[in-house]
Amino acid sequence: MAQIAIYLGADRIISACGLTTRENMEAIGGGTPGVATFRDPSLCEGELTAGRVDRARFGHADFETLLEAAIGSVAAESGVDPKAPGTGLVIATTKGNIDCLRNAPKPDPRCFIAESAQRVAARLGFTARPVVISNACISGVAALVVARRMIEAGTCTEVIVAGADLLTEFVIAGFRSFKSVSETVCRPYDKARDGLSLGEGCGALLL
């Protein structure tokens, strides 16, 4: 496999800190937290302290919508043609559309991550079948490694890599069952730390 220089191109971050990469960096630089305490009976009982995408600004934020927004922005900003034979797409997630299982009488096809990824790719005009990486918390890094290897192998000339996960009833219940969710904003290196803060968001970039 050839050792060639591979560069990062356009990017977009959608999170509780902002809807663009610039907004996120400004929030981080200014010490503005994305984590807040709120109530949402559709997610869990009682209060939850977590990072949530601002629906008032973004609109309906589901797994596929977030991916389409981020990937579409990267393609538009970079000028990359999703239809070009050398353009690849790698999508990373831990749970994908797991919320589609809620109260479903039968499995929704979108519950299968590969199916959901293909729907996103088709709507954005990609001709290549998307590669899906779902390997817990390392999914995003693994997706970047896979994309780099696709370029080194000559399979693609450029690859858009995207990752997304949502705050869902399933995810929150899972972490709460481990007693690992902090009741306040997490303090990861504090002697009195009491857990983590969950969050949702989506990021995409071009290799």
Residue map of PLM features:
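Internal active-site segments that recognize and position negatively charged phosphoryl groups
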Residues: 146
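Short conserved active-site loop signatures built around small residues
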Residues: 140
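Short beta-strand segments
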Residues: 90-93, 134, 159-165, 207
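Conserved "HGTGT" condensation-loop signature of ketosynthase/thiolase-family condensing enzymes
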Residues: 1-130, 149-152, 168, 177-197, ...
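Short, high-confidence coil segments that cap the C-terminus of an alpha-helix
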Residues: 155-157
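Glycine-rich, Trp-frequent "lid" loop and neighboring beta-strands that shape
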Residues: 130-133, 137
